[in-house]
Design a protein with these regions (language model features):
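N-terminal Rossmann-like dinucleotide-binding module
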Residues: 1-44
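Donor/substrate-binding cores of folate-linked one-carbon enzymes
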Residues: 5, 26, 85-203, 210
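Short beta->alpha connector loops
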Residues: 13-16, 67-70, 90-93, 230, ...
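N-terminal glycine-/serine-/threonine-rich beta1-alpha1-beta2 phosphate-ribose binding loop
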Residues: 36, 40-84
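Acyl-group handling in specialized metabolite and lipid biosynthesis
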Residues: 205-218
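An anion-binding loop in the catalytic cleft
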Residues: 217-280
Length: 280
């Protein structure tokens, strides 16, 4: 079976999904793209597509809006396409009724070296924990979240300048680079897939609003990591004069002028830059 004989249905929503979508289009017979339905957003209630839908339209791909994943007509649509694989990147948890459809299984690209950082926010948690490296994993999806057999992994170094945006871009491109070999490994060398060691698993739960709030009593390195983990979106924040202020970049500097601990100085008129004095 050549690559172009392999039928793929792609599932994704975000910018992180798009490099793998393009790789699937280039390498395989991409039958359809499943993404969330367009929604009205903002004060003007403008209809916004997911980044995946925007790209799929540009590439003239068949789009299926996955609103109710248990809907019988939706399931029948997928079955009629006779997929060999589902490829899932930054989408939703697929129910077993969908996982049973593809002939050879469903492959997910996860932005950590599983079993480390299972869950919704692996990139953010790697940065919050000040890791010096992370990576991407391809694995076969099973009903439990992020627990399936590992197909392949690639380690990525986290640099001192990385934030969520830059690291996400690196990982999304790395994951796209693994998809061709991962599909072929499932087809021809499935015995080489590796069971995850559940005793080594760590979790990366969804980020809450409380996680975004800076505690100025924390050590400087913790605050710097927090800013990186949430930049450029959704943004770590603090409150000054009862107003919420998002912080997208920070650095540690010496308090050469002996400003009082807790003081804020060197503030420009738009609060786009300022200094905060901390004890450590």
């Amino acid at each position: 079976m050549s690559n172009k004989d392999i039928n793929i249905i792609f599932f994704g929503n975000t910018d992180f999904s798009n490099p793998t979508l393009l790789a699937c289009k280039k390498k395989f017979n991409l039958k359809a793209v499943v993404t969330n339905k367009s929604k009205k957003m903002g004060r003007g209630q403008k209809i916004l597509d997911t980044p995946v839908m925007t790209l799929a339209k540009k590439e003239n791909l068949k789009i299926i809006e996955g609103e109710d994943l248990s809907d019988a007509s939706f399931i029948d649509q997928l079955k009629d396409l006779n997929p060999d694989f589902f490829v899932v990147v930054a989408y939703r948890i697929l129910p077993k009724s969908l996982l049973d459809i593809p002939k050879y299984g469903s492959i997910n690209i996860h932005s950590s070296l599983l079993p480390k950082y299972r869950g919704a926010a692996p990139i953010q948690h790697a940065l919050l924990n000040q890791e010096d490296s992370t990576g991407v994993s391809t694995f076969l999806i099973e009903p439990k979240v992020d627990t399936g057999k590992i197909i392949d992994q690639l380690k990525i170094v986290i640099t001192k300048d990385d934030n969520y945006g830059s690291l996400s871009k690196k990982l999304s491109e790395a994951g796209a680079g693994l998809i061709e070999s991962s599909i072929n490994k499932c087809l021809h060398h499935s015995s080489e897939l590796t069971e995850q060691n559940n005793s080594m698993a760590t979790l990366a739960p969804k980020i809450s609003k409380e996680d975004l709030k800076i505690n100025w009593n924390d050590k400087s390195d913790i605050i710097l990591a927090q800013v990186k983990a949430f930049s450029p979106t959704p943004g770590a924040f603090t409150t000054i004069n009862s107003k919420r202020l998002k912080i997208f970049k920070a650095e540690s500097i010496n308090n050469d002028n002996n400003h009082e601990i807790g003081s804020i100085y060197n503030v420009d008129k738009n609060f786009s830059t300022f200094n905060v004095v901390k004890m450590h």
